[in-house]
Design a protein with these regions (language model features):
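Glycine-rich ThDP/TPP pyrophosphate-binding loop and its adjacent helix/strand module
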Residues: 39-50, 60-76, 80-186
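Thiamine diphosphate
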Residues: 1-47
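Flexible, active-site-adjacent loop/turn segments at secondary-structure boundaries
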Residues: 10-17, 58, 83, 90
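Active-site metal-binding loops of divalent metal-dependent hydrolases
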Residues: 54-56
Length: 186
């Protein structure tokens, strides 16, 4: 996730890199950690490896995400989908809904918003046969936490887990922040 300092000063170890490299970077970290454990350089323990990416990062980082799925790394890919490249002023992504207005898909006499259907990333990840795939909405936090706990268990025991959330962006969606829960639920 690309944010400015100090908002990335988390209280856990993290790597902040280009958003298209998340799955490749985390795959390498997982493999390096596993080798260190095999050589007894790190004690065995419970560590959860999580990649956080937006739908734009999954668009341009899809190759490395599919590679991580192929290798079935014990990690979680968490995608928050707000329907566009929001860090660049709401350019359309493959997750932008059909007909939506963005800075690169206009509405008017000659243009009708985004002209093609969105990519179904959960279905794409399901086609890789990874152990766990779930979709959640930020408007339902109990379901979100339940599925996140399950993703952690699957990542630890079986391999790659993919979790996608529909996430609101009031600024670029043109909604009021207090209406986002009802917008997501709709």
């Amino acid at each position: 996730v690309t944010t400015s300092y100090p908002k990335t000063s988390f209280k856990v170890p993290y790597v902040h890199n280009l958003f298209q490299n998340g799955a490749a970077t985390l795959s390498g970290i997982v493999e390096a950690f596993n080798q260190k454990v095999k050589r007894h350089e790190y004690p065995e323990g419970e560590i959860t490896f999580i990649m956080v990416s937006g739908d734009g990062g999954m668009d341009i980082g899809m190759g490395s995400a599919l590679g991580a799925a192929l290798r079935n790394h014990h990690m979680i890919i968490f995608e928050y989908d707000n329907g566009g490249y929001m860090n660049t002023g709401y350019q359309l992504s493959y997750s932008t809904p059909l007909g939506a207005k963005s800075s690169t898909s206009h509405l008017g006499q000659d243009q009708f918003g985004k002209s093609f259907f969105n990519k179904d990333m959960p279905a794409i990840m399901a086609a890789t046969n990874i152990p766990y795939i779930a979709t959640v909405a930020e408007s339902n936090p109990i379901d979100f936490v339940r599925k996140a706990i399950k993703a952690k268990a699957y990542a630890k025991e079986f391999g790659l887990a993919y979790l996608r959330t529909l996430s609101a962006c009031p600024l670029n969606w043109g909604d009021q922040p207090n209406l986002e829960k009802s917008v997501i639920e709709a």
